[in-house]
Amino acid sequence: MAALTNDTAYFHALTRLWDNLVSKKLYITGGMGSRAQGEGFGPNYELQNHTAYCETCAAIANVYWNYRMFLATGDSKYVDVLERALYNGVISGVSLSGDKFFYDNPLESMGEHERQRWFGCACCPGNVTRFMASVPSYAYATQQNDIYVNLYIQGKAEMQTADNKVTLEQTTEYPWNGKVTIKVTPEKEGKFAIRLRIPGWTKAAPVASDLYAYTDAAKKYTLKVNGSATRGAEGDGYETIVRTWKAGDVIELEMPMDVRRIKANDKVEVDRGMVALERGPIMFCLEGKDQPDSIVFNKFIPNDTPIVASYDANLLNGVMVLKGTAKEVEKDGTVKDVAFKAIPYSTWNNRGADQMEVWIPESKEYATPTPEPTIASKAQTFTIQAAIQKDAPESAAVMSYAWGVNDQWEPKRSSDTSKPYFYWWLKNGTVESLAYEFDKPYTVSKVEVYWLDFDHYDGDFRVPQSWTLYYNC
C-alpha cells in the first residue's frame, strides 16, 4: 500500500518496524517471534533459543516482507535478511524428505522437538509448498535499464529492461561455494547496468544493525568481466557494472567462504559467552548424533579453535560440515579435548529427535555438564487440564505431558523463560494439578517448586494463591 499510494507515513512506519526487528528481535537464523503465546514478540532483545517460537510461516513472511521492502527501495540490506531467512529459518521448517514439518523452529533442543506430518492448525505445510515454487522470483529484479542480481542460484532467466531483452545464465554451487559465473546474452548489443548484490555475510555484520557482529575481518571478493579484473560503482550493497553488453560476455564473482564466528549484542542475555558458526549464508549447529558422546550442552569452542569446512556427499543428501576440536566439561568439572562436527541448521532433526544448539559456549563457565539423574528427573510428569470453555463437563478434561518441570535446567529467576517451562494457558483463578509418576517407590525428603512469573498480553502467570502436595504411599 505504501508503494502503490506513495504514502510516506506508511513507509516510515514500515521502516521503524523493520529497524526494530533487525536491531532487536531478529534471530540469527532469520527467524522471528520469540514467544509461543500469541505467536509473537517479547521485549527488545528477548531472543530465547530453547523456547524460541520462530514459526515457519513467520520466516516465510520475513522473506515476503523484505522482498517488498527491497522493491520499494532498491536497498540490498533487505535481501540480506531475505537470504538469511530463506537458507536457514524457512527450509529448517521442512524435512529433507519433504513430508514432515516444524511449526516452530527453536535454536536449541534437548531432543523434544520433531517434525510432524500434519498439525491441527496446518498453516505451515501449505505455506512451505507454495513458497518453494516462488523462490526463483526473488533472484532478479529490473528497473528501467538496471538489472538487479539478488540471489546466486544456478539457472537461466530472461528479463525485459526498458530497451532490451536480456538472458542471464548463472553457473554456481552457491551456497556451498562462493564462485558465481554469469553469462550475459542481450537480445541486441546495448548499454545497461547489472547490479550484483554483495551479501552481508561478506562484510562486518550479518545484518544492517549492531544486533550481531563477526569476530573477524572479511576477505575481499573479486570481480571479473571477460577474464579481466574490474570494479563497479558501490552503493546500497550492490556493485554496479555499467557497460555496453554483448552476447557472450561473462561476469565472474568470487566471494571467499571462510568459517566465521558471530557474537550477539551483549543486551541479548541468553547469548552472552556464546558464539554462532556461519559459512556463507548458512548457519550451523551442533547435533547430538554427530558428537562422540551424543551430547552438545557440555561442550565449548574457544575463540582460537581452528575449524575446517568440508563437503560430505553421504550426509543429509550432501552438505558442508564444520569440524574441529572442542572442549568437553565432565561431571567432576574436568575438561578434555573432543572432536566436534557441525551441520547446517536447516538439516537438523532429519535423523530422529536429538539434542541441538546453534549458540555454542566459548568458555567453560557457559557449558553445562550432564547432571546425574535424580528422583524427579526419572519420573513421568503429566497434568490433567480441564477444558478452557466454561461449564464444560469433566469428561472434556485432557491428561497430557507436563514439559519443563523435571528436565534439570535450573532457572535463573522466576521470569527466566530461556529454557522449557510449564504453564496453564488461559487459566486464572482455577484449580489445576500436575503429577509425577515414579517407576518404583522412593523416599522423598523435600519438595520445592520454582514458580513462573511471566507477563503476556493474553494473560499473566503468577505465583498461585496456594498449593498443596498430595502423595500415594
Say what each PLM segment does.
Residues M1-A3, H12, T51-F70, P125-V135, ...:
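Well-ordered alpha-helical segments within folded domains of soluble proteins
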Residues A2-T15, V22, F70-D80, P186-K188:
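Structural helix-adjacent loops and short alpha-helical linkers that scaffold large soluble proteins
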Residues L4, A13-Y27, R84-S92:
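Alpha-helical scaffold segments in carbohydrate-active enzymes
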Residues L14, D80-N88, G93-T185, K203-V225, ...:
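C-terminal beta-rich recognition modules with glycine/proline-rich loops and embedded aromatic residues
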Residues G31-E55, G98-A122, P420:
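Carbohydrate-binding/catalytic loop surfaces
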Residues I194, Y221-L223, W467-L469:
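Short beta-strand elements bearing conserved aromatic residues within extracellular beta-rich modules
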Residues I198-Y212, Y450-D458:
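Short amphipathic, basic-aromatic surface patches that mediate peripheral association
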Residues E372, S415-C473:
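Aromatic, loop-rich ligand-recognition surfaces of beta-strand-rich domains
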